[in-house]
Amino acid sequence: MVNLGSIWQNLLASQAPLQSMTGNATTMAGLATYSLPQLPYAYNALEPYISAQIMELHHSKHHQTYVTNLNNALKVHVAAIASSDIPAQIAQQPAIKFNGGGHINHSLFWKNLAPAETPETNYSKAAPSLAAEIEKTWGSFDEFKKAFSAALLGIQGSGWGWLVKESTAEKGRLRIITTKDQDPVVGGEVPVFGVDMWEHAYYLQYLNGKAAYVENIWKVINWKTAEERFQGSREDAFADLKALL
């Protein structure tokens, strides 16, 4: 099987079916399925910065489509494993990668947003440890915001921008990265928070005004969640996904 990286191996492993052996045949049953997470706020809670219309379409339509397509692809993939059909297994991997990434990214994204002017969106009070590390790395929050915003606006086509924490060689070090399409954060990095730069995240409200969307997204970043992810492990950051099975 093609190596899709640890996140995809974990995704497939989490779907490991019950197996019963009859001679040389493997029977697979009990396939788990993923479900759409509930938002921790109402669709209109992020207004005026993200409209209720965008939030409802983004969550109930776009994210739901990723979940549906992921479950369908995993079902076909498991059947291909059961029949030892390697070409069919390989054929499903792009769909698993794309839709699995869409489910992972959006599940993280919803949790790192919160209504403006709430305790969760107060940068210095909600995220003291993260704020100290940001200012150590970039010199000030303003310089960090400038660098992160530039990375978001530099994405060509569709993708995501992420603040990540290294959890390997340089444990605790912060970096800004971008991922293309629905590729998630892979390897040993912890996603502290992410921003969706697909057009469906902003176009109905901002049209082609990506810069205005990027400026306003800062008003609804959930720094409490970001602080928890910064202080936690990669497993902690992805724990919510396991609960969606």
Swiss-Prot record:
Protein's UniProt name: Superoxide dismutase [Mn], mitochondrial
Self-association state and partner proteins as the record states: Homotetramer.
Organism superkingdom: Eukaryota
Gene3D superfamilies: Fe,Mn superoxide dismutase (SOD) domain (1.10.287.990), Iron/manganese superoxide dismutase, C-terminal domain (3.55.40.20)
PANTHER family listed in its UniProt record: SUPEROXIDE DISMUTASE, SUPEROXIDE DISMUTASE 2
Cofactor: Mn(2+)
Keyword Transit peptide: yes
Transit peptide, from-to: 1-32
GO molecular function: manganese ion binding; superoxide dismutase activity
Organism, as annotated: Neurospora crassa (strain ATCC 24698 / 74-OR23-1A / CBS 708.71 / DSM 1257 / FGSC 987)
Subcellular location: Mitochondrion matrix
